Amino acid sequence: MFTNRKILKFLIFFFCFSIFSSIAQTNEDVPLNNMAINEIPKPISSLIFEDFFGNEIDLNDYHGKLVIINFWTTWCAPCKKEMPLLDSLYQDKNFKNLQAFAVNMEQPNKLKTKKFFTDLNIQKLEIFFDQNLNFVKEFKLRGVPTTVLINKKGEEFARIIGEVNFQDKKFSKWLLKYD
């Protein structure tokens, strides 16, 4: 009986060690602590939103591209911090198929959002709006900033909840695999 107990303890230890090792290995592949990667990318429905001038944009038109959708507001301090970093990433010449959308989640106020971008010296990113809250419904958004990553097939493969350093070398290197 005493030997069986030792064997049982060893098996429990081995089982726990195996589980924690696999969890640790999985997390090594995730470049950010606040990122969730979908093991099986989630298909998304066709989403229509508006650019700064009121033109309709259909997300389906961007199949074949790596799409970053960043949800933000003008009053969000982390959004203000990360927007210039996203703008720099969007200008990175290493990315050949990158499309970034900075979607403002407030009631459209063109003067306020334009001033936000001007004050931050945003060069390439454009302002988009989600007046009908299509994104909120589709992605079940709960707060800002939130960034959704969509692969070339039009599927959500990862999501970042909270602030992200888009200039983080580990993140950029990881993201390039999807370009």
For each of these PLM feature ranges, what is it?
Residues 58-80, 86:
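Short active-site neighborhood of thiol/selenol oxidoreductases, capturing the structured segment around
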Residues 44-45, 67, 144-145:
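Short loop/turn microsegments at loop-to-beta-strand junctions
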Residues 81-120, 131-138:
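Structural microenvironment flanking redox-active thiols in thiol-disulfide oxidoreductases
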